[in-house]
């Protein structure tokens, strides 16, 4: 057997598990097991070691507890930690850890999981886990030549300028989770700018070529401004960029951390021309940000493959801004170029409050920017009428 899935319904029973343990053959019950998906519960955690194989390549751990009983069972952690520490690593390729528990004490797993990572070899390709790792484990991952998927939580190791890593893995997907972006984005910039060689190769050369998906799930400690654009735009082959920013995300001055303006967004769009999905913050419900509907035109023109968009922008003067796009000569050349195939626009809680002729101007302006637009999803006043008017003007009913 090469694949086993243990879920919340799996229970061998106490007698059966005792017999399995007492009669455990020298090579284990599953000597050829390659892929183990393990949904941890009080019932199955005590015999999970019976399913481990020295040839294990992929392990997915999900700590799933009942919503009716959200407290972590006290017996789970002391049992689980030593089992994780003992995971075989000679052929391990993938570690995935997740939970439905909002207060999972991930720090308890830092040392055992770090010890596992430090034993992983060059065949390791994926680390997808909210468990923080030691500096040594992080440095080890940085030097793994075939790492493709990495979810990072916490800051990077501290590297003096004279000892920056000379390599960085050829990642295809990078997720910056809790407290990660504020440290890792500057490090990536340092790797690119401070370690260039006469061969024009840098530690980021392969990552710049291969990275397709970048997700920033936690913006704590950073401002989404010009320096953010500078750090991200180097990954020119991205097909998906997701930056989770809301109006209530504030810096220590009480200001919204989303500081991009229309020119910044244009610069980003001109760099990331392969994007198919762009979530650049969630639409602003307070209309306080500097970006306006004007930035949507360069996005539509330069990101010609885009089919999903959500962006933080100010709709206070949306009708006037759209008139400006239609009438201002400086937009004439852009308006003559083909647009992206975007059909759906998520406007979240962005206020609109327009009706009648003013609303029609906005709808026509948005269709001019996104000719394939079929629907706008918004909960505030005016957006339902907006979507209905799109259908009328595009020649079909919604």
Regions found by a protein language model. Name each.
Residues 1-398:
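Leucine-rich repeat
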